[in-house]
Amino acid sequence: MSDSPAPLADPHLVYDPVAGDGPKDVVVLGSTGSIGTQAIDLVLRNPDRFRVTALSANGGRVALLAEQAYRLKARTVAVAREDVVPALREALTAQYGTGEPLPEILAGPEAATQLAASDCHTVLNGITGSIGLAPTLAALEAGRTLALANKESLIVGGPLVKALAKPGQIIPVDSEHAALFQALAAGTRADVRKLVVTASGGPFRGRTRDELAAVTVEDALAHPTWAMGPVITINSATLVNKGLEVIEAHLLYDIPFDRIEVVVHPQSYVHSMVEYTDGSTLAHATPPDMGGPIAVGLGWPERVPDAAPAFDWSKASTWEFFPLDNEAFPSVDLARHVGQLAGTAPAVFNAANEECVEAFRSGALPFLGIMETVTRVVEEHGTPRTGTSLTVADVLEAETWARARARQLAAQTAEARA
């Protein structure tokens, strides 16, 4: 991948090597979520490599946030919800003891963005949703290495991220993109024939579109492989998550959409593959566990020993691969479409999907109604203007419209079903 210009994520480049033998200072955004809690577990097991200086969370789990701050000796904690500050201060006092100095507390919608620009080596953005865009931009602008688990910020603000990021500054934390990142180290970008992104197929692999009509929220939340938050789990059930990952792969590695393939791999052992022009394919494989991708994001270019379990190759196992059923799961094709449209189209796609997932969880939309509504919102948005630079204001305006329109359409569907 030595071609010029370099892609956003390049395993051949190290943006900011650590001087000396001391641990890296890390800020963890979304510390009480799935990625955040696993990252903190990794840090606690490797105090010689990493030191967490600050934590942020939405504010729904203040007891856990306080425990994390105490165990990590974090200097600052931040919550998006200002109303939970008294409860957070009480939880911190319970951890530290009366009379002991507490970490600095930041609160409000900009708190995570403030932390992203604070003094540290690496920012791990583990926030869920497009609200992670501002912290992503802040970390890049401040010159921090960005371990990116918040795929939505790249998807909705691709041109903005690309304008700020320096070569090698972004390390992907998604399991699929961390896998591609490592497999791409074997050659140059000119050597790459295609990227192959694997999908477990979710809980409804093998079902026809008609069979998906009766899917319930409980069904959709029962992912066969990964333990994730409810939004990402439902995105995996619709395969929207895989569509977002296709857009992300295009933006990270500068590979055209027609050279990014999705295949279903139920075992989730192979996380992605790179096919090279000489006919060889390099696959990255581990048992399903986010410890490895998180360790790559925080530790690259070094390997973190025992970050994740390894295979026992003495035991027989079956590894299967199947083509994706685009009729039953149209989300990947729709994601390719909006990715090629570019501009504000990916932001509209993502925002509409977030609203439709909430509508499905509340009972307003049926399972198939998620993608039907998202498709309609994307179609109504039309083709973004070309020849103009995307701004944060453009993204926010498009998201606001898409959310309002998705809610309106979901309400109409709920009324018709009543």
UniProtKB/Swiss-Prot annotation:
This is 1-deoxy-D-xylulose 5-phosphate reductoisomerase. NADPH binds at residues 32-35, 150, 152, 229. Pathway: Isoprenoid biosynthesis; isopentenyl diphosphate biosynthesis via DXP pathway; isopentenyl diphosphate from 1-deoxy-D-xylulose 5-phosphate: step 1/6. Belongs to the DXR family. 1-deoxy-D-xylulose 5-phosphate binds at residues 151, 175-176, 200, 223, 236, 241-242, 245. It catalyses: 2-C-methyl-D-erythritol 4-phosphate + NADP(+) = 1-deoxy-D-xylulose 5-phosphate + NADPH + H(+). GO terms for biological process: isopentenyl diphosphate biosynthetic process, methylerythritol 4-phosphate pathway involved in terpenoid biosynthetic process. Its EC number is 1.1.1.267. The keyword NADP applies. The keyword Cytoplasm does not apply. Transmembrane segments: none annotated. It holds the Pfam family DXP_reductoisom. Its cofactor is Mg(2+); Mn(2+). Catalyzes the NADPH-dependent rearrangement and reduction of 1-deoxy-D-xylulose-5-phosphate (DXP) to 2-C-methyl-D-erythritol 4-phosphate (MEP). HAMAP family: DXP_reductoisom. It comes from Streptomyces coelicolor (strain ATCC BAA-471 / A3(2) / M145). InterPro entries: DXP_reductoisomerase (IPR003821), DXP_reductoisomerase_C (IPR013644), DXP_reductoisomerase_N (IPR013512), DXPR_C (IPR026877), DXPR_C_sf (IPR036169), NAD(P)-bd_dom_sf (IPR036291). Keywords: Isoprene biosynthesis, Manganese, Metal-binding, NADP, Oxidoreductase. Mn(2+) binds at residues 174, 176, 245. GO terms for molecular function: 1-deoxy-D-xylulose-5-phosphate reductoisomerase activity; manganese ion binding; NADPH binding. The gene is dxr.
